């Protein structure tokens, strides 16, 4: 099985990837590296695994959805 990786807002533009499928990853950081081809992670990126906030060192498994998005700001 595979892992679905999504990028939102400005991260979509920076990575050039909206959504991709990777074969495997051990952590969310590993999923970032594989989905972006090793692009450095910008500061303050948020990650969610299966719609729940997580850290970059959180484990991922086959069938998971990993989403990356910039911090939410408002005013």
Question: Residues of each region from the PLM?
Answer:
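Ubiquitin-like/PB1-type beta-grasp interaction modules and other compact soluble beta-rich domains
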Residues: 1-74
């Amino acid at each position: 099985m595979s892992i679905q990786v999504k990028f939102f807002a400005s991260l979509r533009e920076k990575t050039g990837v909206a959504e991709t499928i990777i074969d495997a990853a051990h952590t969310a950081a590993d999923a970032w590296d594989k989905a972006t081809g090793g692009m450095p992670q910008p500061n303050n990126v948020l990650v969610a695994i299966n719609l729940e906030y997580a850290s970059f060192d959180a484990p991922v498994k086959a069938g998971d959805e990993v989403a990356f998005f910039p911090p939410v700001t408002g005013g």
